[in-house]
Amino acid sequence: MAQHQHSPQRPRDQDNTRPHDQYGIVFSVSGDDVARKQGDSFSQPDPTVATMGSVDTVTIGEALEATALSLGDKPVDRRDAAAIQAAETRATGESKGRPGGLAVAAQAAATTNEQTVSEEDKVNIADILTDAAERLPGDKVVTSEDAEAVVGAELRSSSEMKTTPGGVADSMSAGARLNQQL
């Protein structure tokens, strides 16, 4: 069995018991802090619209990207396409899929996958959702209403009336739960 080499750690004392202290100083910098250092200023963001680098909340795009991480190798099916369309609709407010958007790409992938015999030639979830947050104009924080809409869309598209474990509906629901705890 191989032994792992650990980088030197700062010694812990009795008063220094927070878990993150054993790894050194932990800090965060917001965009406002960077702007102040550079002499710029940012306008106050709309609280319902996510900003890049937000550490406090989970956006719809980030929830979709989480699906790409958890089920990236899974071929896109109609259930996934319906859930992605519902998520994109909730993020953008547009009921019709945008050309080049996630929903249109997912629907095309599902249709292609139904006609493709070889598993290795099928379009996977990661192919569609890896950069979802960047591809969603107006990405916003996931709410429980957003998650419910996506769960409903995925259920309606399933012959078994089940959502995919670790799929789009699960990721949206997890994001909404995290956001409610904040």
From Swiss-Prot:
UniProt-listed InterPro entries: LEA_SMP, LEA_SMP_dom
Chain span(s) of sequence motif Nuclear localization signal (NLS): 7-11
Location of the SMP domain: 58-115, 123-181
GO terms for biological process, alphabetical: intracellular monoatomic ion homeostasis; response to lithium ion; seed germination
Source domain of life: Eukaryota
Family: Belongs to the LEA type SMP family.
Entry protein name: Late embryogenesis abundant protein 3
Organism of derivation: Arabidopsis thaliana (Mouse-ear cress)
